[in-house]
Every structure is written in structure tokens, then in C-alpha cells.
Amino acid sequence: MRILGIETSCDETAAAIVERDGQGEGRILSNVVLSQIAEHEPYGGVVPEIAARAHVEALDRLVARALEDADMKLADVDAVAATAGPGLIGGLIVGLMTAKALAMAAQKPFYAVNHLEGHALTARLTDGLPFPYLLLLVSGGHTQMVLIRGIGDYERLGTTIDDALGEAFDKTAKLLGLPYPGGPAVERMALQGNPKRFALPRPLKGEARLDFSFSGLKTAVRQTATELVPLSDQDVADICASFQAAVADTLSDRVGRSLERFRNEFPDCETPALVVAGGVAANKTLRAALETLCARHGFSFIAPPLDLCTDNAAMIAWAGAERAATEAPDSLDLAPRSRWPLDEKSAPLIGTGRRGAKA
């Protein structure tokens, strides 16, 4: 089965073709991603209207290129899958309407994919990972620990009660006058800094709950920077290094408790694994801390290649293929959802907004 996938939930426009065989093994035939960093950089963050217009301008040619790279025509695909949420509503509409039109024109089944499910299942595409396993999703919009039991069977163990980790990186960068995107900029500066100079907080460390919190850490960065004005380059580097060290300690504590929870629930699991996905998973310091943690607990550490950690359409095509193996297609009347929790059974946390839980 060969699936055309489309991803337009935020600031990457993407199209891909993925093949899933009868044994459930996957192969990427093409994967095309166009970043909008240049469009959003002057504003220091993603502007939804600009993002939606950029998707409109680029998506048709990216779909054509994905088909060309896979040496296929639209008639050759077996189904079309697209991100239906969560994300920026304008971008979701562009991708979803395009996918529906292609599915209708080619008379192919259509599958609406939860963007978070795409991240959740990527390790099955890249590593053939069996169920169950743990997922740590760390990105600009999400920070979650999710227990992956099977297709459509997800339990959110913990989530951020305020800022997502990627957002904390971006806001820290902005406070310190670093360029957008903030995550890579903070990581680069941290290489030149002293991680022990500033004693920044480790939010929720030691608590039994499995949730995350990063707003207090971000506030501590602001207070530290304000006290040092004017900031030298070394001050900025030391703040970045101290911030990154605090994040690594916090993640190790929070994730470590989730690993223990997994062991208690699945004592006979022979292949316990932690999968890390999302753009923040590219941070080498955080990856090293999590690898050390997994080794200590006897878990495999799995981080898909960077181009599959960040937003892409191969993961959407793969999630569509996984669902197509056992489920009926979705209706072409299906609407996009700006907020779409991966685990819809979990109650939204206080502070998730009047519109409901985003994830």
C-alpha cells in the first residue's frame, strides 16, 4: 500500500509518499519539506496568516515533486492522508482541502490524521518498533509523555501545565536577543557557556505527578537577564547553558518517573523503549541526558532521524497507512480541528484554554 501524505499544520509545507507492506514494514519513497523560517523570522515567531498563504503557494508543486521523486503518478497511490489537526486552522484547511480534492479526483480513499499520531508512530516506520512503548513529544506546541499501546490506543501520562518546551526555548532566545528559531540559537550559545553559573529552577522535580512545567524557568531566565543588563556575550552564553542544564535535569526527572510507570504496567515487556520526537529532540544535550537515563533504566532510546523528528509528511502518510490497514476511510466532509488531543479520554488540564485541550 502506497500513501500520499500532506502536512500543513504549522510552518512547514510537506508532501511524501510512503509504502507499507503486508508485514507492516514501511519504506519512504519520497519526502519533501519546505520550511517557512525566512518568512516568519522578521516577526520572531510564526504568523498564522503568513503561514497559510505560504502553504497555498507551495503545496501543489510539493505534491507534484513528491510524486516525481517516487516515480509515480497520482493514480498509482492507494490512498491520500493529510493532517487534520491539531494546528493553525488556516494551514490545516489548506492541506485538508487539497488532500480531499486529490482523493476525489483520483477516486482514492482519504484518511484524516492527527499530527501527534504521526509523531507517535514514526518509530514504527524507521525502526519497526513493536507495541507498547513510551513517547516523549517535545516541540514548539507540545510537551507530552504518552503511552503507546497500539494504533489509536494512546494514554497521556503527563503534559505541560503551562508552556511547551519548544516555546520556552523560543522565548528564552527572544529575551536574550538571539535569532529565530530560538532552539538552535540557544543550543549554539550554550556550547560556549558555563551551565553551573546560574542556579535556575527545576520545575516539578521530585513530584509524583508526571506533568511538566516550564513557565517558571522562563521567568527565572528573564529575572536573571534583567539583573545583568547590559548583557555581555558571556552572560548570554552562561544563561543559555544554565537554562539547558535545568531543562535536561527536569526532563530526566519527569521522564524517569514515566519509565518506572511503564515497567510497573508491563513487567514482561522484552523491548521497553523510549521514543523522542519533535523539533526539540534535535538538541544534543537533551538527547545525551535522555540516552543516559534510558541506559540506567534498561530502555532502548529511539530518536528518528532529524528530518523525521520535525514536522514532515512521511509521518502523516505512515500514520494513514497504519490506519488504512485496519480501518475504513474518513468522510470527505470531515472538518479540521485546531485542538485535537491524541488521548481524548484524558481530561484537559486547568489552563488549557476556553476552547478545550489542544493536545
From Swiss-Prot:
E.C. number(s) listed in UniProt: 2.3.1.234
GO molecular function list: iron ion binding; N(6)-L-threonylcarbamoyladenine synthase activity
Gene Ontology biological-process annotations: tRNA threonylcarbamoyladenosine modification
Keyword tags: Acyltransferase, Cytoplasm, Iron, Metal-binding, Transferase, tRNA processing
Domain of life: Bacteria
Localization per Swiss-Prot or TrEMBL: Cytoplasm
Residue stretches spanning the membrane: none
Protein name from the UniProt record: tRNA N6-adenosine threonylcarbamoyltransferase
Source organism of the structure: Brucella anthropi (strain ATCC 49188 / DSM 6882 / CCUG 24695 / JCM 21032 / LMG 3331 / NBRC 15819 / NCTC 12168 / Alc 37) (Ochrobactrum anthropi)
